[in-house]
Design a protein with these regions (language model features):
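Structured catalytic-domain cores with a bias toward divalent-metal coordination
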Residues: 1-383
Length: 383
């Protein structure tokens, strides 16, 4: 076995600054160019720290597996995926979700790797799907190698994309605001990889193949799906890599005990899928089933005010049930200072905002149902 730790430099946007990624590589002794690869990163939204804690514990487990010669596939781990956002502290408040330089949400607008892909592979594909997979991966890697940018956040995206683009399994580890455990994944992968939801104890798994936001995980699945749709009748195009976003509860849930528990769950998942030798035992009983992303709703505040929640995380509600009351502390008539906020669908209260001071249009919570909602379009609900 061989483990290496690579320090990948990023060009600093300001004089006198320098940033870097620490990348942990595990490679079995018999690895080849066609060996399976696993990529895991944490805290792309840099203020979402439960993933950073879980990956810290996962590295301990992987180091032990490496010493025991138990690692069977290439594994790449980036425990801190966003040093730019990590430094964005304003008067003691960590603002790590969006780039303060003006590029918006760090998990939006990742490279479109389908653009030009069909032309790159057109004269190289054949009847062998395994050989075609190599051709497609090589084309995507070549595309990324040719790209360049002077923008710091875009350079971060290119660097992480180059690390992840040839992986068979991609785990992007996040958390929500105030939340229970849940996942996002493409519906076509649920049957094979639902044990990840079981191991983590997820209470929801929302499925979508294209959220329309060019998020990190979809960057690596969409090219395969779009290529298959374009030329799959002519050539056998293999299934896209398994990509998933793990939401490890909420931002406050940063504890050794939870991080260790989540790391062990991910480790058992990797064992079950042949990445690490050993018997993980049977998968736990699932606490959820996969539901379409557009069966989930995020009620918005109709005005500004103070939130007073009337239902808790994990509660199941019906359409019309009272969720919260919005209080106007400046109302002249105190008796008329409250607006009732009600559920617009049946489902589970999965997450909610921590800040109780809201503006008009701010989200209140997320209710995950099973029936597709007419006003939803399979797009992400918050930015």
């Amino acid at each position: 076995m061989a483990k290496s730790v690579e320090r990948v430099a990023l060009a600093g946007a300001s004089l006198g600054t320098a940033r870097h990624l620490m990348v942990h590589h595990y490679q079995p002794a018999n690895a080849t160019a066609s060996s399976r690869k696993i990529y895991i990163q944490a805290s792309l939204h840099a203020d979402e720290l439960p993933g950073m804690m879980a990956v810290h514990h996962l590295l301990h487990l992987l180091d032990a597996a490496d010493r025991a010669n138990a690692i069977q596939c290439d594994i790449t781990i980036v425990p801190v995926a966003n040093p730019i956002g990590l430094a964005q502290v304003i008067n003691g408040y960590h603002a790590g979700r969006s780039d303060l330089a003006g590029n918006g949400n760090f998990n939006r607008h990742w490279p479109d790797l389908f653009a030009g892909l069909q032309d790159r592979v057109a004269d190289k594909l054949g009847a062998d799907p395994v050989a075609n997979a190599v051709v497609i991966r090589d084309a995507i890697k070549a595309d990324l190698a040719e790209r360049s940018t002077l923008d710091e956040a875009e350079q971060l995206k290119l660097t992480l994309s180059r690390l992840a683009c040839d992986a068979d399994i991609v785990l992007d580890v996040h958390c929500d605001d105030d939340s229970l455990m849940h996942l996002y994944m493409p519906a076509e992968h649920w049957a094979e990889y639902k044990d990840l939801a079981a191991e983590l104890g997820a209470v929801a798994c929302m499925t979508s193949s294209d959220s329309g936001s060019f998020c990190f995980d979809e960057t690596f699945s969409l090219p395969w799906n779009k290529l298959r749709a374009a030329i799959g009748a002519q050539y056998p195009i293999p299934a896209a890599p398994f990509v998933t976003t793990l939401e490890l509860r909420g931002q406050p849930d940063v504890f050794d005990e939870l991080g260790e528990k989540d790391a062990k769950a991910i480790y058992r998942f990797l064992q079950r899928h042949g990445v690490i030798a050993g018997n993980p035992g049977p998968a736990p009983e699932l606490l959820c089933t996969a539901t379409p992303l557009d069966a989930a709703d995020v009620p918005l505040s109709p005005a500004s005010g103070l939130l007073a929640y009337k239902r808790n995380l994990g509660d199941r509600v019906k359409k019309g049930d009272l969720l919260a009351e919005l209080i106007d502390p400046l109302a002249e008539d105190v008796a008329a200072a409250r607006i009732q906020l009600r559920a617009s669908n049946d489902g589970l209260i999965l997450s909610r905002r921590q800040s109780k001071l809201v503006r008009a249009g701010d989200y209140i919570n997320m209710i995950v149902g099973t029936e597709v909602l007419s006003h939803r379009t399979a797009k992400l609900m918050t930015d």
